[in-house]
Curated annotation (Swiss-Prot):
Gene Ontology MF, one: oxidoreductase activity
InterPro entries: AhpD-like, CMD-like
Name of the protein in question: Uncharacterized protein MJ0742
Similarity annotation: To M.jannaschii MJ1511.
Length: 104
C-alpha cells in the first residue's frame, strides 16, 4: 500500500531524469516506512500532523488527499490529528489545515 501512495506523478519525473536519486529516495522511503512498530496508516497520520504544524498548504493537501484516497483515512481521523496540532502548534496551523480538510 505505501508504494501506491509514495510513487505519484512527481516521482515519475525523478525516475526518468535522475534514476540514481530515485533509487536513493525509494530506499529511504522503505527504511522509514517499515510497518514494524507503527502501521503505514498511523505513520501517514503523523505525517499529516507534521506538515500541518509547518503550515505547508501544498504538503497538507497532498498528504490529506493521498491518506483518504489510498489508505481510506477519514476526515474524522484527520480532524483528530489536527486537534493535536492545535495543542502543539497553535491556532494558525490548526485553522489553516482545517480549511484545507473542509474543502476536500
Amino acid at each position: 500500500m505505501k508504494n501506491e501512495v509514495f510513487f505519484g506523478e512527481g516521482m515519475k519525473v525523478v525516475k526518468e531524469k535522475y534514476p540514481d536519486l530515485y533509487d536513493i529516495i525509494v530506499k529511504l522511503n522503505d527504511t522509514v516506512f517499515t510497518g514494524k512498530t507503527l502501521d503505514y496508516k498511523t505513520q501517514k497520520l503523523i505525517a499529516i500532523g507534521i506538515v500541518a504544524s509547518r503550515c505547508d498548504e501544498v504538503a497538507i493537501e497532498k498528504q490529506m488527499k493521498s491518506a483518504m484516497k489510498e489508505l481510506g483515512i477519514t476526515k474524522e481521523e484527520i480532524a483528530d490529528v489536527l486537534r493535536v496540532v492545535l495543542l502543539t502548534s497553535g491556532m494558525p496551523a490548526f485553522t489553516k489545515a482545517m480549511k484545507i480538510l473542509e474543502k476536500l
